[in-house]
Amino acid sequence: MKKKQPLPRIGFLGTGWIGRHRLKAILESREAEVACIADVCRENASDAAKLAPGALVVDSLDALLELGLDAVVIATPSAGHCSQAVRALEAGLSVFCQKPLGRSAYEAQMVVNSARAANRLLGVDFSYRFTDAVQKMHQLVSSGELGEVYAADLVFHNAYGPDKAWFYDAELSGGGCLMDLGSHLVDLALWFFDYPQVRSVSSSIFSGGQRLKGGSGKVEDYAVVSLVLENGHAVRVACSWNVSAGRDAVIESSFYGTQGGVAFRNVQGSFYDFVAEHFRGTSAETIATPPDDWGGRCAVDWVRQLRTGGGSYNPQAENLVQVAAVLDAAYGR
């Protein structure tokens, strides 16, 4: 009888709301053992420990790295992502990080270089890829059923803004709504088009209704970005915080081909419920509807790769740098 392989032992660095959500999803998947919780906030650590009572609770990355773990999930403020991920990778741990991987393409490249050098698995929580709606859209695009897909429109308007002060400090966050929300949209667009070269990037970025210039030090609350891809195909991205959207959020993505189109949109302003449709001329076929418990799937996919692949480097991590480079270009840096 074949001996059962032990589950990967992982730690969590940062256990705020999103960290605890991903922790719960990984526990429920039974793909890994949560062996350590690290958070400087005792309340967050205590709440996380209730989900994983067998995990050791520590207060620093240093302490976590001493435990001989296989991997770490990083869910800390953005300013720490690059340095924390690099330290973990150099210590031999695989890494799953909240987006953004870095505040710039330079930081993202540093992390990817470290993952490659250490031969460790690197993932980033671009979670919208794993909604049922987006998965079914991607299948249609990849199948060729839509013909040549030549244009895409992607939108994420949030009627609220982040509740943490660091989001509004460009040095700490790397940017405003474009970094926070637009990164998801740029990731989706490049993924759907299979990571082509980007010929040009133009943008209009605002704060409080005033156009921002590069290097202003302010973070934006509204951004529109246009991409022209190597084959001339066009992508438009728009995102915002605190916009008068008439609902909690407007989240939509549409892809148009020579033989049809696909789109997904949120339902009644929800941040979590989506429908997707397949367009043929003036007809629309619904291909995905709620409910769909998708929030932790990206993390579970990463931990499954960790378990089955031994945590080795996946070259798809190189694509994370392209997402960051597009954001850099949109910011004019």
Where are these regions (language model features)?
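Hydrophobic residues in well-ordered beta-strands that form the structural core
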Residues: I74, C97, L122-V124, F264
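Rossmann-fold dehydrogenase core element
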Residues: A108-Y128, G147-L154
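Active-site loop of classical SDR/Rossmann-like NAD(P)-dependent oxidoreductases
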Residues: V40-E43, T289-V300, P315
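N-terminal Rossmann-like dinucleotide-binding module
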Residues: M1-A52
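Contiguous beta-strand/loop segments that form the cofactor/metal-binding neighborhood of enzyme cores
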Residues: D187-G269, A299-G311, D328-A329
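C-terminal helix-rich "cap/oligomerization" subdomain common to oxidoreductases
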Residues: M1-K4, A32, A63, A71-I74, ...
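Predominantly a Rossmann-like dinucleotide-binding segment in NAD(P)-dependent oxidoreductases
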Residues: Y128-S216
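Beta-loop-alpha module in the N-terminal Rossmann-like domain of NAD(P)-dependent dehydrogenases
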Residues: R22, E43, A52-S114
